[in-house]
Amino acid sequence: MDNRRFYLLTLLPPLPALGEQPAVTLPEALGLLRQQGGRDFELLADTLGAENELRDALAEWVRNTPVTRSAPAALPPFLTALFDEERIADFAEDAWVDAVWQAWFGEVAHAGRSIGSRLLPRWVAWETALRSRLARRRAGGGAEDEPRVTLDEPGDPPDLDAVVAAWHAAREQGAAEGPLPVAVEAELLLERARLDFLDAEDPRYSFSLDELVAYLLKLRLLDRRARLEPEAGRSLLRRAVAL
């Protein structure tokens, strides 16, 4: 047993229910990983930590014009290379943003394989498949147009049909109940599905790398939910309803 993992998994506080404030933030937890040292922990912390930096960089980038903006210095090189005006000119903005996120997810999967995590590549495959299906449904595609999820890892691939169908049904109720409350419920449904996937994959009480990874991925979701300002959340949901 790796003493670093045992120490961290006994030190980190229990995770709360969805919607409650975690006792530790994701950046704080990643800081604890870095304090333990080791290439595996540093790579895991750097890769997961790049997500918040990427969100900030994308928000700053779209607010500025090509004349005033420059490649974000805080991002790792594999992401900085995508913030190139000539490269961006070949894409519609939405397609470019999708490509940037695909690069981050791809790096997470690669990092997982590099450090011996089975869960990280499986989570990336599940999350990106879910996002792809939701995008197709938002664009008016039917269930028959949705690709099957493959995880390229041992174990049975999860079935996303029920998740996407329930999300679609919740959105369809908006005509009768009002779009914003239904959008809130649809978003909560997705967050519960994400937590359910991680719970099913979590090798609890093993003090393994993937138990630590599962903790961090759950904390990522809970921390983001707790940090979402109410008005910002309503604004995001209004945009989601309009899609």
Predicted regions: what they are:
Residues 1-243:
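Extended alpha-helical surfaces
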